[in-house]
């Protein structure tokens, strides 16, 4: 299930993004400041390049690139 980013509380969205950008394996040695990485993800969400996907099976939200989400979730 896709969750519109603009329907989340601002603080919840920020924490979700921060969790994503600080996860092990996502920085690849990148020393870009946290705030810059958060802004990049926000930009991708507003441009529709990234989405928030809620996996019903695992009961977890994750940020994904739009092209990585199965097409049936956009119908």
Curated annotation (Swiss-Prot):
InterPro entries, per database record: UPF0270, YehU-like_sf
Pfam families recorded: UPF0270 (PF06794)
Domain of life the protein comes from: Bacteria
Family (UniProt): Belongs to the UPF0270 family.
The name this protein goes by in its record: UPF0270 protein PSPTO_1630
UniProt lineage: Bacteria, Pseudomonadati, Pseudomonadota, Gammaproteobacteria, Pseudomonadales
């Amino acid at each position: 299930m896709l969750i519109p980013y603009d329907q989340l509380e601002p603080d919840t969205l920020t924490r979700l993004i921060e969790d994503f950008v600080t996860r092990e394996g996502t920085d690849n040695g990148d020393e870009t400041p946290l705030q810059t990485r958060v802004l990049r993800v926000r930009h991708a969400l507003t441009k529709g390049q990234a989405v928030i996907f809620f996996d019903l099976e695992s009961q977890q939200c994750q940020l994904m690139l739009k092209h990585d989400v199965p097409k049936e979730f956009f119908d």
